[in-house]
Amino acid sequence: MPRGKSKSAGKVNNMGDMIKRLNKKYGMEVAHDLNKENPTEVKGWIPTGSRWLDSIICKGQKAGIPIGKISEIAGLSATGKSYMAACIAAEAQKQDIYVVYFDSESAIDPAFLSKAGINTDPNHFMYIQAITVEQVLEMIEEFLGAEQRILFIWDSIANTPTDSDKEGGFNPNASVGKKARTLSLAFQKLTIPLANAECTLLCLNQL
């Protein structure tokens, strides 16, 4: 019996070392001890500013959008998507979460942000013009190395062209499906790094 216990303990130690080795090799937390942490557990929530909406999203819990995840606000044009995103940003700042706002429509101004309760000081907020889909995604990936909880707001996906759209002409068929493929790959690539960094991506889209 004592030998069995010793052998079992050795295996646990070896696997503990393996977790460290894997995480070091891949440069991020990919292997976990579920007795210590659950990587799929939501670390926190950012309220939307509407307790009624929060309770619907979270099945009765007054929460909001999940930290470390990718969320989307979709709706028709001029239905208040940007204002809701701004309200979420203001709530995020209350939790000491930095806000990065990607604007593809050049429609956001400081007065609008202040009305929603956002602190636009550069120590708390950064405004970036969304030139192309690829540039936005590359910048998000770069921000993830900042060791800072960040809320990324992308306003909006629909109005952000791809690199090929920007460089090409005005033929809508020239790059059919390129944006969808790029976003699909990017979201797969960003899902785990966002969760590990406790950063949140809120995408706005038009129906």
How would you label these PLM feature ranges?
Residues 3, 7-122, 140-145:
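The Walker A/P-loop phosphate-binding site
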Residues 151-196, 203-207:
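Conserved P-loop NTPase nucleotide-binding/switch module
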Residues 108-112, 135-137, 160-164:
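Switch/connector loops and helix/strand junctions flanking conserved nucleotide-binding motifs
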Residues 93, 102, 125, 157-158, ...:
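Intrinsically disordered, low-complexity linker/loop segments enriched in Gly/Pro
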Residues 120-130:
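Conserved P-loop NTPase mechanochemical-coupling segment
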Residues 12-15, 46-50, 54, 67, ...:
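Amphipathic alpha-helical transducer elements in NTP-driven molecular machines
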Residues 137-152, 190-191:
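Short amphipathic alpha-helices and their capping/turn segments at secondary-structure boundaries
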Residues 96-98, 123, 148-151, 196-203:
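Loop/turn-to-beta-strand initiation segments
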